[in-house]
């Protein structure tokens, strides 16, 4: 109560922020006549003037009013688009490193030009991040004309570019691209063998469009670069044939002589937990699988891999649905993005899940992959010196943005008042009744010519609805992952009179739905069909479409604008709001309503019991609908419950990934220093001394007399590592103290090293150290990632021993990291001492082969969304003594099963 009184007196934080920015808007408006009076060349020359002032130390904040006024004037001259006052506020919010929440149709694409132009004046590069290649290309071309007019260069990063094209795009003042492309380029750069081959510059300023989609919805999905293992794929087919013989059961509580008076009992061969997205064998199921696979004990260490793949096959059959989670296209399983409904070709689930689904669908199975490099979007975007974002819906996730990214959300007022009523939800008992009601409402709208956008949460549901509409003879467009190519075209015309569009989730996001139709889109379509037409003819067609669409716009406004019809609630309220936000843009009329049933996934998994009780209490008959505040409240509570659960998962993930992030930074920094030639010899000398120290500590033990040291093992270790026989007179052996032995060993090793250096020469030695060190780092880092994966899989069990799994993970991960650093030093030293002088062309060939090997057969994966942390693919191979132990303990093989 006290807080609300204070808020009334001083205003909310959002109101105070807007109040602070309005005087700057007035200042920009005051400069408008001055900028309008400049010629094109004079306006363009302002960019050079700003760059000089910036280079001399003037802050961007002091340049802001003039720079924004120049950019606004350029927008008017190039596109006849003038930034509104609220768009200037949006630009200032982005420049200050915050998130601007702007409703659909308020011109976010144009807003981004203001902070992008201002920050590009530093010459450090600005990245504008979009959700797909289409938007990256569209926005870089569309807004790029403004930047080019002002003398700035623009680049775009999309799938399929080679390194030279990428390097050129990143060198531009402003670079557009997708989050996946930016992230994978970072990982790829850190696998290269020359700084000249890097494509990215240091991270300065990033504007993330649809920031909620990228930083929240995709935060649980790590980017993974992986290489194939040599494992046979036969096991997936064998296990897949077992699954149909297993019966799904359930867990129930029965009376028992326990403290609670109840115990859990499982029926059937396996149980499914849809909330946790997991499937588990029961005791009966384990026995049946053992019998079918003809093995004696599924939990025997020899068969643990079978257990893992059986569980993944269960998940593939019980939890992953065709045309919902994936589609099968041309003999390939392609993932469907859960949040956007878009296909993600080339992306694969990890940890054997993708192979299990391929076996289930009877398509060719590709080998599992081993992780070579990985990063989460959370840690990628936190590398930018300044990060900002914009979206139509961020306020519901403001807490998460602040806690994880230290980003505040500012809600920007609309340019015109919102005229869209959002009608209460209508709930039915069954999905059949719900769809019947949806068809009736569509008929009503269609008869009067009102355009309708129907939102579904999966391809499967959009196709069911499409079939029902075909039976009724109602013409419509279906927009889902299968029609991805026509996405923008369909969405652009969804506001035309009588148009009915069915769309999955957020498909078409980024393209405005204009009432009456989009004349530019229609003219472009005509141009594609008539490529040889003269420019005059195109101009006449465009004018014709503009007149038609303007007249149709007025008709559609009278009919009530675009009606949004949601057929199911999403787990996140934000995504429901995004669907609603497609209507009522820039003061246009519109409306929205959601139709639900107790069979919908959200209500069935998270809230159906409570909602069902309310419906029974209100005596709702079959076929009868209910619109009640209690029901709406129960649904919102179910959504809040899921949102809180997902937030905890993302928070949990970043706490685990922060450990890996610090290790990744150390390795990547070390690689860059080696590539830059920074103190290569000094680094190697340190490795040499560390290796000498490790050998001395292992054999010359304090408080043990020298006569009892294992001299045979010492001689073998020195020979194996340094390639020479250590020469210690027999009469002095027994009298050596550990410190004397260290000194003697160090002198002998350094003498041998100096001999190598003399015969190789400084230049060749530096080159060899660089190549061998990089090879050792990449090889050991790959194995370390595998060890960390195994550690993550088993760390939860530490909780049963009254230990904090998170703290245990940090300790174990640190120990594994230090072991890896020791192995890198050991491998580098050993190879340098054993290497022989070769011709220069042999060394160059070795380096070239190494680069080709590293870049060959790499695969770009999206790791599966984990419950605790990403779990990239495993590989199985025979372990050498210093490799991570295959049993999954996280220890070296020699200190575990190899004892």
Curated annotation (Swiss-Prot):
Its EC number is 7.4.2.8. One of its GO terms (molecular function) is ATP binding. GO terms for biological process: intracellular protein transmembrane transport; protein import; protein targeting; protein transport by the Sec complex. It is found in: Cell inner membrane; Cytoplasm. Zn(2+) binds at residues 885, 887, 896-897. It is an enzyme of class 7 (translocase). It catalyses: ATP + H2O + cellular proteinSide 1 = ADP + phosphate + cellular proteinSide 2. Coiled coil: none annotated. Its main location: membrane. Part of the Sec protein translocase complex. Interacts with the SecYEG preprotein conducting channel. Has a central role in coupling the hydrolysis of ATP to the transfer of proteins into and across the cell membrane, serving as an ATP-driven molecular motor driving the stepwise translocation of polypeptide chains across the membrane. Monomer and homodimer. Part of the essential Sec protein translocation apparatus which comprises SecA, SecYEG and auxiliary proteins SecDF-YajC and YidC. HAMAP family: SecA. This is Protein translocase subunit SecA. It comes from Geobacter metallireducens (strain ATCC 53774 / DSM 7210 / GS-15).
